[in-house]
Curated annotation (Swiss-Prot):
<feature type="disulfide bond">
    <location>
        <begin position="43"/>
        <end position="78"/>
    </location>
</feature>
<keyword id="KW-0716">Sensory transduction</keyword>
<feature type="disulfide bond">
    <location>
        <begin position="74"/>
        <end position="132"/>
    </location>
</feature>
<dbReference type="GO" id="GO:0005549">
    <property type="term" value="F:odorant binding"/>
</dbReference>
<keyword id="KW-1015">Disulfide bond</keyword>
<comment type="similarity">
    <text>Belongs to the PBP/GOBP family.</text>
</comment>
<dbReference type="InterPro" id="IPR036728">
    <property type="entry name" value="PBP_GOBP_sf"/>
</dbReference>
<dbReference type="GO" id="GO:0007608">
    <property type="term" value="P:sensory perception of smell"/>
</dbReference>
<dbReference type="InterPro" id="IPR006170">
    <property type="entry name" value="PBP/GOBP"/>
</dbReference>
<protein>
    <recommendedName>
        <fullName>General odorant-binding protein 1</fullName>
    </recommendedName>
</protein>
<comment type="function">
    <text>Present in the aqueous fluid surrounding olfactory sensory dendrites and are thought to aid in the capture and transport of hydrophobic odorants into and through this fluid.</text>
</comment>
<feature type="signal peptide">
    <location>
        <begin position="1"/>
        <end position="24"/>
    </location>
</feature>
<keyword id="KW-0552">Olfaction</keyword>
<feature type="disulfide bond">
    <location>
        <begin position="121"/>
        <end position="141"/>
    </location>
</feature>
<dbReference type="InterPro" id="IPR006072">
    <property type="entry name" value="Odorant/phero-bd_Lep"/>
</dbReference>
<keyword id="KW-0732">Signal</keyword>
<dbReference type="Pfam" id="PF01395">
    <property type="entry name" value="PBP_GOBP"/>
</dbReference>
């Protein structure tokens, strides 16, 4: 009987640890999203982005929201450039992306995983010659991978974070 109780306690502990990791990963993604979004205003002004792009950002983490606006890709590329996350060739700068993730709460392992996912998405879309279109497809691929890991932050928590910073 005592052995069964120990096993139950072990399983419960492992489950709770797994839940905590998922929650903390979603929290890191929230911090990354809000940190990345700090460049949105500058890019919106520089690129004269339409309101539809702002709506796309508002709905970015919703799985059922279809991202189709090429301007969204232009905005993401502009924002990534502001944080030195891309090279002159418009490719992911692995070292800077890794450090950006760590500076927003990711541990080394999670930062590596995020960079790897972005690199995989970048590789899958390499045949797209239009930088904005390719960046949009990379973002869609990345969003799908994050949802697959159950790391996507809720829009409510992101909005709360953004509103408290205003």
């Amino acid at each position: 009987m005592a052995t069964v109780s120990k096993w139950r306690m072990l399983v419960l502990t492992l489950c709770l640890t797994g839940v905590w990791q998922v929650e903390s990963s979603a929290d890191v993604m929230k911090k990354l999203t809000t940190g990345f979004a700090t460049a949105l205003e500058k890019c919106r002004d520089e690129l004269n982005l339409p309101d539809a792009v702002m709506q796309d950002f508002f709905n970015f983490w919703r799985e059922d929201y279809e991202l189709v606006n090429r301007d969204m890709g232009c905005a993401i590329m502009c924002m990534a450039t502001k944080f030195d996350l891309v090279t002159e060739e418009q490719k992911l700068h692995h070292g800077n992306a890794h450090e950006f993730a760590k500076s927003h709460g990711a541990d080394d392992s999670m930062a590596k995983q995020l960079v790897t996912m972005l690199h995989e998405c970048e590789t899958q879309t390499a045949s797209i010659s239009d930088d904005c279109g390719r960046t949009l497809e990379i973002a869609k691929c990345f969003r799908t991978k994050i949802h697959g890991l159950k790391w996507a932050p809720s829009m409510e928590t992101i909005l709360e974070e953004v509103m408290t910073e205003v």
